[in-house]
Regions:
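Helical anchoring/docking segments at protein termini
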Residues: 1-79
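Helix-turn-helix repeat elements of alpha-solenoid scaffolds
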Residues: 33-46, 74-88, 120-139
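Solenoid-like repeat scaffolds
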Residues: 53-57, 90-97, 183-186
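Amphipathic alpha-helical repeat scaffolds of TPR domains
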Residues: 57-71, 96-118, 127-134, 138, ...
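Structural motif corresponding to the intra-repeat A-B loop/turn of tetratricopeptide repeats
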Residues: 75, 115-116, 120, 169, ...
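Boundary/linker segments of alpha-helical solenoid repeat arrays
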Residues: 96-100, 137-145, 184-195
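TPR/TPR-like (Sel1-like) alpha-helical repeat modules
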Residues: 128-135, 172-188
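Eukaryotic acidic, Ser/Thr-rich intrinsically disordered low-complexity regions
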Residues: 179-207
């Protein structure tokens, strides 16, 4: 029997937070960042359609702040990205459109995973993000399948990256279960190839 994959069947999963965060209040944009930091964020923000970093930072949609954090991936700017993601976390709730949560958790996971070898909390935060994205998987897959603007189910960052993480940890049975679950939900990837490769690894471990 395959193990239960974390996140399966849950719409929302609790965050494992690095620290207690206050509820959003007041002018968070000017309170969280110095004038110099705000100028830095505006300076690196260069969307194709124009706009300001401040407009995204003041949004109540976590995906907007996640989008802004993606512009702060350089090592010397990552602390600013962490602040944006901390703020975004306080905005996650069941009123946020499920597709926005799906993309936010992918961005959040990717951002933290990038710094897994630099910051001691980063890998755990990345795993938590991918688990939360997986928890929304079945509902989001249904949306992609039925929405006329999509009509297909793309790849899933959470399933893909968490599979890699669990393989690196030697958790082959869990990695296989992730593949099976992602395949069942219809997410694009060569899941049969991954399952076959993992099966060979598991068989070799028994000999």
């Amino acid at each position: 029997m395959l193990p239960t994959v974390v996140g399966k069947g849950n719409r929302m999963l609790p965050f494992i937070r690095r620290k207690a965060e206050p509820k959003p209040s007041g002018d968070w944009w000017t309170g969280a960042f110095t004038q110099e930091e705000r100028a830095t964020i505006e300076g690196v923000f260069a969307p194709l359609g124009g706009g300001t970093a401040e407009s995204l930072a003041r949004s109540t949609n976590p995906n907007s702040l996640g989008t802004l954090a993606e512009y702060l991936k350089k090592e010397h700017l990552r602390h600013l990205g962490y602040k944006l993601l901390d703020r975004a976390d306080t905005l996650v709730n069941e009123n946020v459109p499920v597709l926005d949560l799906h993309f936010y958790f992918a961005v959040r996971g990717g951002f933290y995973y990038r710094w897994r070898d630099h910051d001691p909390f980063a890998l755990d935060e990345a795993v938590t993000s991918f688990q939360r994205q997986i928890g929304l998987g079945a509902n989001v897959a249904r949306f992609f399948r039925e929405d006329k603007n999509w009509g297909f189910i793309p790849a899933h960052a959470g399933y893909r990256q968490l599979r890699i993480i669990e393989e690196k940890r030697g958790n082959w049975t869990l990695a296989r279960a992730l593949c099976e679950q992602a395949k069942a939900e219809g997410w694009a990837d060569d899941w049969d190839h991954h399952i076959g490769r993992i099966d060979k690894k598991l068989a070799a471990m028994k000999t």
